[in-house]
């Protein structure tokens, strides 16, 4: 699965913002627009027993250039909420369901 960080017109969004993957399927988050973005999973909104720090970028770590990527593989089934730390206040949030 590929998720774009930022819309082509510069919007502060994940595209798609809600999606599903199979357990063990790689998710590639790809910076699309000219803003620094990152991917942080919300420790309160992921399946129990999953360590958010092991699947998240650091809040200070950013994908600065268009085309830069961050890949993660989720195996525990359930719903995971994530956000872009710099733009969470602007509504740059998403959700993935692992089936």
Swiss-Prot record:
**Compartment(s) where it occurs, according to its Swiss-Prot or TrEMBL record:** Plastid, Chloroplast thylakoid membrane
Q: Report the protein's function.
A: Participates in electron transfer between P700 and the cytochrome b6-f complex in photosystem I.
**What does the organism's lineage look like at the top?**
Eukaryota, Viridiplantae, Streptophyta, Embryophyta, Tracheophyta
What domain of life does the UniProt record list for this protein's source? Eukaryota
Give cofactor(s), names only.
Cu(2+)
Q: How does it sit in the membrane?
A: Peripheral membrane protein
Q: Where does Cu cation bind?
A: 37, 84, 87, 92
* Location, primary (coarse class): plastid
Domain Plastocyanin-like spans what residues?
1-99
Q: Which UniProt keywords apply?
A: Chloroplast, Copper, Electron transport, Membrane, Metal-binding, Plastid, Thylakoid, Transport
What family does this chain come from, according to its entry? Belongs to the plastocyanin family.
Q: Which gene encodes it?
A: PETE
Q: Which organism is it from?
A: Lactuca sativa
Cellular component terms (Gene Ontology): chloroplast thylakoid membrane
Q: Which SUPFAM superfamilies match?
A: Cupredoxins
User: What name does UniProt use for this protein?
Assistant: Plastocyanin
Q: Which InterPro entries does the UniProt entry name for this protein?
A: BlueCu_1 (IPR000923), BlueCu_1_BS (IPR028871), Copper_blue_Plastocyanin (IPR001235), Cupredoxin (IPR008972), Plastocyanin (IPR002387)
Kindly give the CDD domains that the UniProt entry links to this protein. Plastocyanin
User: GO: which molecular function terms?
Assistant: copper ion binding; electron transfer activity
């Amino acid at each position: 699965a590929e998720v774009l960080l930022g819309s082509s017109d510069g919007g502060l969004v994940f595209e798609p913002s809600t999606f599903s993957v199979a357990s063990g399927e790689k998710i590639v988050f790809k910076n699309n627009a000219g803003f620094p973005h990152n991917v942080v999973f919300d420790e309160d909104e992921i399946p129990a027993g999953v360590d958010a720090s092991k699947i998240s970028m650091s809040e200070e770590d950013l994908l600065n250039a268009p085309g830069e990527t961050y890949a993660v593989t989720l195996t525990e089934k359930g719903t995971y909420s994530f956000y872009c730390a710099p733009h969470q206040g602007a509504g740059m949030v998403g959700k993935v369901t692992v089936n």
